[in-house]
From Swiss-Prot:
It comes from Lactococcus phage SK1. GO terms for cellular component: virion component. Its main location: virion. It comes from the Viruses. Belongs to the skunalikevirus head completion protein 2 family. Probably functions as a stopper that is part of the head-tail connector and that locks the viral DNA in the capsid. During assembly, functions as a docking platform which the preassembled tail can bind to. Plays a role in morphogenesis of the virion capsid after genome packaging. Keywords: Viral capsid assembly, Viral genome ejection through host cell envelope, Viral long flexible tail ejection system, Viral penetration into host cytoplasm, Viral release from host cell, Virion, Virus entry into host cell. GO terms for biological process: symbiont genome ejection through host cell envelope, long flexible tail mechanism. This is Probable head completion protein 2. It is found in: Virion.
Length: 56
């Protein structure tokens, strides 16, 4: 999937039936979980919600 902005990506992520979002690496991969690996990061805040977004 491609998104035009971080807001579009975040809003789409909220609609997915996910159990968890993992920033980093785990030994096992679980169903309905998003795993994100970040090389560098920046905290982005909006509407009383904040999350970390990575840049390559």
């Amino acid at each position: 999937m491609e998104f035009d902005s971080y807001i579009d990506w975040y809003n789409n992520l909220l609609t997915m039936p996910l159990n968890d979002v993992i920033l980093g690496v785990k030994d096992t991969i679980e169903d309905k979980t998003v795993y994100l690996s970040l090389s560098d990061s920046k905290v982005i805040k909006m509407d009383n919600t904040s999350f970390v977004m990575g840049y390559y």
